[in-house]
Amino acid sequence: MKNVDDLIENAAELAERGLSKGEIADELNVSRETASWLVERSQPTDNSQSSSANNPTEAHDIHVDWSAVGRDSKRLTYIGQAMADLLMKEGEAVDLTIGIEKAGASLSTVVAQELDTDLGSYAPAKHQWDEGDIDELGGSFSRNFAQIRDRDCYIVDDTITSGTTMQETIDAIRDAGGRPVACVVVVDKQGVDSLADVPVYSLIDVVRVDSDTNDRDISNK
């Protein structure tokens, strides 16, 4: 089991390899803000203790480690098949499955095979993000895979943390003339039923419970 110190060490190693904070967030399945916090904690300074005292803000997130699935092709196939099963109710008109890079790409391959659709790949803006406004950056669809071309699409990713990346992908598909029909993830840390009028399915919903959590925030979980 990983603790925060392990995550800080992992973040430091990824940063040393040249990954952006957005890519680190993707690798560790945490928000961009949490990834930034982890990287900052991996670079101690002489006044780190006084800085922490003056800035009590801490990261609030849930780390999801599904590497036991991702490193084994058979387990990955089983999970992908379960995700495809969640989408069965949407009918047979959909002919394109979009995987959000990086982890969503491998999952989407299984989903596309199960549902007999073409396969597309989307690289989100967060992979370029280090600091500042992410709205100034843009994602892109890979030209090595199927293009949107006015098609109905499923969207596949491993985790929803804030929903920003999934929302971005939905918007990108619409901007390209496609129609997002449904999204599916392994783990949803927001517990959302839909984003931008597109239904969201998940194998696992995770709810963080704090002492100050409002009852209505967990009433449906």
From Swiss-Prot:
<dbReference type="GO" id="GO:0006222">
    <property type="term" value="P:UMP biosynthetic process"/>
</dbReference>
<keyword id="KW-0238">DNA-binding</keyword>
<dbReference type="GO" id="GO:0010468">
    <property type="term" value="P:regulation of gene expression"/>
</dbReference>
<comment type="similarity">
    <text>Belongs to the purine/pyrimidine phosphoribosyltransferase family. GfcR subfamily.</text>
</comment>
<keyword id="KW-0805">Transcription regulation</keyword>
<dbReference type="InterPro" id="IPR000836">
    <property type="entry name" value="PRibTrfase_dom"/>
</dbReference>
<comment type="function">
    <text>DNA-binding transcriptional regulator that functions as a regulator of central sugar catabolic pathways.</text>
</comment>
<protein>
    <recommendedName>
        <fullName>Transcriptional regulator GfcR</fullName>
    </recommendedName>
</protein>
<dbReference type="GO" id="GO:0003677">
    <property type="term" value="F:DNA binding"/>
</dbReference>
<feature type="region of interest" description="Disordered">
    <location>
        <begin position="35"/>
        <end position="59"/>
    </location>
</feature>
<dbReference type="InterPro" id="IPR022854">
    <property type="entry name" value="GfcR-like"/>
</dbReference>
<feature type="compositionally biased region" description="Polar residues">
    <location>
        <begin position="42"/>
        <end position="57"/>
    </location>
</feature>
<dbReference type="GO" id="GO:0019856">
    <property type="term" value="P:pyrimidine nucleobase biosynthetic process"/>
</dbReference>
<dbReference type="Pfam" id="PF00156">
    <property type="entry name" value="Pribosyltran"/>
</dbReference>
<keyword id="KW-0804">Transcription</keyword>
<dbReference type="InterPro" id="IPR029057">
    <property type="entry name" value="PRTase-like"/>
</dbReference>
<dbReference type="InterPro" id="IPR053401">
    <property type="entry name" value="GcfR_halob"/>
</dbReference>
<dbReference type="GO" id="GO:0004588">
    <property type="term" value="F:orotate phosphoribosyltransferase activity"/>
</dbReference>
